[in-house]
Amino acid sequence: MKKISNGLKKIIAPAIAVLGLLALSSGAQAQYPNKPIKMIIGYTAGGAADKLIRPIAERTSKIIGQPFIMEYRPGAGASIALDITSKADPDGYTLHITDSGPMVILPNMRKLAYDPLKDFTNIAMIAGGGTAIVVRPDSAAKDIKGLIALAKKDPSKWSYGTSGIGGVGHLAGEQLNKLENLGITHVPYKGGNPAVVEVLGGHVPFLFSSLGAAATQIEAGTLKALAVTSLNRSVMLPNVPTLDESGYKGFDAAIWFSIVGPKGLPAEVMAKLVPAFNEVMKDPAVIKGINVDGYDMMPMTPAQMDALVIKDLAKWGRVIKEANVRDE
């Protein structure tokens, strides 16, 4: 056999090296994930985000072959968890269940260490839902138009409660306040359950409540839902009209939950995660659990999620500015 000339060796050797690197790279990509994945949660254990993500993570782990490890990092309206996620290595081993609060509302109210448009990769949309406008069954307001008429007649006797400043309920109330030029007072409480207790006790005339917080009372008949603030009717309250249907065309005030990672997740990581999460979101048991918690499914592609963040950042920015909403 003839010896390979030095010139030919110089050509072949680099080519072999490149092929070797490509093979190694391909092998590494095929192995993702090869260790547990951290799922950061910006609230305490047992909250809405935790309840939503656990069955999803459990089923997704069976598809991708690795477990999810829950890490709770509450504080600052869940912005701490998003900041941690933004600074994580974009290797697919740090994900985060976030929501519209720290993603599109808080950035309009305070200076944050992250940019919701530049620092994250949107992976999967989980679900969303509006708030319910609720009154006691003995209220003089029998429907949303009746409530507005009463509030206009004597604004000093009317106020609305919410779970706190800057929440979707508060901002929905400010939108309605502006549309009808009501001039009624916002009464923020420290959470959804305390707010429900106050409206039940007659201390506030009506409430913008999450469906989950008010569902038991609505079902029992101790609270009456006049309308929901999402664009579409809720699966939980199919007989309750939306504000859009009640004459406020285009009215849409809803919270949503999604799964994100740091900016720059590799294509091979997205190719594993996106189909896996999407498959789980079609599971009837997962859908039922999400509906029971007061949310509706919101199937979206990562590109559609990008567009939603842009749209909602602008929308809530306008509402916050017009209502002069100040951070707590």
Residue ranges and their predicted role:
Residues K2-A15:
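Bacterial N-terminal signal peptides that target proteins for export
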Residues N34-P36, K178, L182, E219, ...:
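An extracytoplasmic/periplasmic, membrane-proximal ligand-sensing/linker region
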Residues G128, A214-K282, K311-A314:
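C-terminal lobe and pocket-closing loops
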Residues K87-Y93, S100, N108-P194, L243, ...:
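Hinge/capping helix and adjacent helix->loop/strand transition within the periplasmic-binding protein
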Residues A30-D119, K157, I165, N181-F208, ...:
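N-terminal (or domain-start) structured segment
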Residues K51, P55, R59, I80, ...:
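Extracytoplasmic/secreted proteins, especially bacterial periplasmic and envelope-associated proteins
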Residues L24-G27:
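N-terminal signal peptide c-region/cleavage motif recognized by signal peptidases
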